[in-house]
């Protein structure tokens, strides 16, 4: 507690993460692209325009009063940087449409791992900084990432499932690359 009678949502989240008793379960709405609808914006606008994203996130915070909230829920950010094609729609996050490793059982060079300057990452990180400034004292902010297997399936396509039987070492190497992506 912070010396006040009531703890902030952020404090509640951190208490939960420390496996300490809490007075209630934390409220963490994964608003995703629904956040855009709250301000009259499409999913595409929310996921490609920083001003729209921040405006939508602030509206989620005002309306739902969450203890914590993700800044962006787009599991294709890393895949896009690594060469996957995306299909965009105005009512949902983008979908991966092409898989750069579909025709080759290679593991990309670690020199291609996304950085803070890659793709849409600068926009997301800037939105995170702005949200931290606006609500970060009271609301826990979450940064989401694409997990290693999901990213491997984005890169390789459906062949990843046969690869698990046909070439376990390749899958382990590819998952290692994808885990490094998540760690970065």
Give a label for each model feature.
Residues 81-184:
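Active-site-proximal, glycine-rich beta->alpha crossover segments in alpha/beta enzymes
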Residues 1-91:
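N-terminal basic, low-complexity leaders that serve as flexible interaction/assembly modules and, when applicable
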């Amino acid at each position: 507690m912070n010396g006040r009678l009531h703890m902030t949502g952020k404090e509640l989240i951190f208490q939960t993460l420390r496996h300490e008793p809490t007075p209630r379960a934390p409220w963490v709405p994964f608003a995703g692209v629904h956040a855009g609808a709250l301000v009259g914006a499409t999913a595409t606008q929310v996921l490609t325009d920083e001003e729209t994203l921040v405006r939508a996130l602030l509206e989620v915070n005002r309306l739902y009063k969450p203890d914590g909230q993700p800044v962006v829920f787009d599991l294709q950010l890393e895949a896009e940087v690594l060469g996957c094609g995306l299909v965009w729609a105005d009512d949902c996050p983008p979908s991966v449409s092409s898989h750069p490793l579909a025709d080759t059982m290679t593991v990309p060079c670690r020199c291609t791992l996304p950085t803070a300057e890659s793709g849409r990452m600068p926009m997301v990180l800037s939105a995170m900084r702005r949200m931290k400034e606006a609500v970060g004292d009271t609301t826990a902010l979450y940064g989401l990432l694409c997990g290693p297997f999901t990213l491997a399936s984005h890169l390789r396509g459906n062949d990843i499932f046969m690869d698990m039987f046909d070439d376990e070492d390749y899958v382990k190497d590819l998952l290692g690359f994808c885990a490094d992506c998540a760690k970065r």
